[in-house]
Amino acid sequence: MSYEFFDISSPKEMLEKAKREYARMKSDLNTDNIFNFFVTAYHVMDHIKTVSGVDPKAIQGMYDDDFRMCQFACNKGKHAILKTITPYSSFADSVGGGETIYEVVDGSKRVRVEYLADKLINKWEKFFRENGI
């Protein structure tokens, strides 16, 4: 057993953390859990770049619209003001006083965070399989 505080040392461990954050987000959809998921899901890439030896072209292939939305949500939560111009925005609305809907918006395209999170987890799992991680 390790007694280090931050002991995530591999891409697999970071993906497993993202899955735990995803489960928390699905069971209790709120800004804290949304923030934690997107920060973790985005930073899976850091571990891939530093320790996995995956071909840079495969890594570059992950940078699609979904991953850029993830990057936006991660950075939007971490920084008071984004220094990079982005086409994305975030939106939350309580429908009829009921549940709050959280979305990432790209122009006229609105993506619920739960849907985006599900797509990201599936893409990461596929990426890991295809690259032997």
PLM region spans:
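Acidic, Ser/Thr/Gly/Pro-rich intrinsically disordered interaction regions
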Residues: 1-35, 53-133
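Extended, well-ordered alpha-helical segments in internal regulatory regions
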Residues: 38, 43-52, 80
